[in-house]
């Protein structure tokens, strides 16, 4: 199933919204770990401009792809975090998602893994890793 995944600021986890099927447009799950294939990174410029104008976060960015659901999602994420590249998005700094180490813009990936973690202060945040197999 093709989905749109974003970090839910209120629930502090990833929300998974269906892009097809009878539940199209609805959140079908929440998860601390998500794995997607055939991915595109999406940012609504209008939503980003609203963040810049209001200085308040809103849902305007995320990743679309084919949702991989199953028992091995956690191990696939661990593999991605070792061999993949970390991706980040900050509407105050970037117009799009970027490779964290190089700040190179990124718009697609073969595989994307997302996981919630707690930072040093205990605040829950989302980590995103991507991998292209070309």
Regions found by a protein language model. Give the residues of each.
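Structural detector for short beta-strands of small beta-barrel domains
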Residues: 1-8
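A short, compositionally biased
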Residues: 8-15
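Acidic, low-complexity, intrinsically disordered interaction modules
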Residues: 15-126
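Short acidic DE-rich linear segments
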Residues: 130-134
């Amino acid at each position: 199933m093709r989905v749109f995944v974003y970090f839910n600021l209120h629930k502090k986890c990833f929300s998974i919204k269906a892009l097809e099927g009878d539940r199209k447009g609805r959140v079908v799950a929440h998860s601390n770990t998500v794995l997607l294939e055939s991915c595109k990174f999406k940012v609504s410029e209008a939503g980003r401009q609203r963040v810049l104008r209001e200085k308040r976060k809103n849902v305007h960015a995320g990743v679309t792809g084919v949702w991989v659901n199953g028992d091995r999602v956690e191990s696939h994420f661990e593999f991605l975090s070792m061999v993949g590249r970390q991706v980040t998005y900050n509407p105050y700094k970037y117009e799009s998602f970027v490779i964290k180490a190089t700040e190179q813009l990124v718009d697609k990936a073969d595989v994307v893994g997302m996981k919630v973690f707690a930072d040093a202060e205990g605040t829950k945040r989302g980590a995103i890793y991507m991998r292209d197999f070309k």
